[in-house]
């Protein structure tokens, strides 16, 4: 049996539920709905968890209950509990340096300035894990300056225009995830 572990990064709580920074959560919530798989809180994993099977593959989904900057705590707990080979692990994360809706897959790499990935790299003591980055676009420049407010952008809610683009991205990504075989 092939086992795939998908961890979506985001911040817990209603306040952040529709924010750009919660793209990882939103992808897995859409995936779980498609396969009628409910999330259950598992304190020992510091996450809400769900799973489903497609053919000979089991997909385990995790939404960390830690805040983004401490995502590594939950990832470490999950990796240790399931004794995961890192080839089986996929981290789904927002990326402000990619255009809205662009998907980028990497088998290894730096945090790219993303604090959630930085936390995971610190906890796992390696850069060698799969990550699926989803573009949320760059923050707009502050009027009359050459600077932008990154925090306001990533923590800001997804607009209706962005949602229509991201809904298509979720569908493409969900179709792609079902093709993963380790």
PLM region descriptions:
Residues 154-157:
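Intrinsically disordered, low-complexity regions enriched in acidic/Ser/Thr/Pro/Gln residues
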Residues 2-107, 118, 122-133, 139-152, ...:
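Nucleotide and nucleotide-moiety/phosphate-recognizing core
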Residues 111:
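Phosphate- and other anionic-substrate recognition elements at nucleic-acid/protein interfaces
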Residues 114:
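Glycine-rich phosphate-binding loop at the start of an alpha helix
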Residues 160-161:
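A hydrophobic, small-residue-rich beta->alpha segment in the mid-to-C-terminal subdomain
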């Amino acid at each position: 049996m092939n086992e795939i572990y998908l961890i979506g990064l985001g911040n817990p709580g209603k306040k952040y539920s529709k924010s750009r920074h919660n793209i990882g959560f939103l992808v897995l919530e859409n995936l779980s709905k498609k396969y009628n798989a409910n999330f259950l809180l598992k304190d020992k994993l510091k996450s809400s968890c769900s799973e489903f099977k497609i053919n000979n593959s089991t997909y385990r989904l995790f939404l960390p209950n830690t805040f983004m900057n401490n995502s590594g705590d939950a990832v470490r707990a999950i990796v240790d509990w399931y004794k995961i080979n890192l080839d089986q692990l996929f981290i789904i994360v927002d990326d402000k340096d990619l255009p809205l809706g662009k998907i980028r897959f990497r088998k290894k790499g730096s945090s790219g300035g993303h604090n959630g990935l930085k936390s995971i790299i610190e906890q796992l003591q390696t850069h060698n894990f799969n990550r699926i980055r989803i573009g949320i676009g760059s923050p707009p420049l502050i009027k009359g300056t050459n600077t932008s407010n990154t925090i306001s952008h990533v923590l800001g809610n997804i607009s209706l225009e962005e949602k229509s683009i991201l809904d298509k991205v979720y569908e493409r990504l969900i179709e792609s995830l079902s093709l993963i075989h380790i």
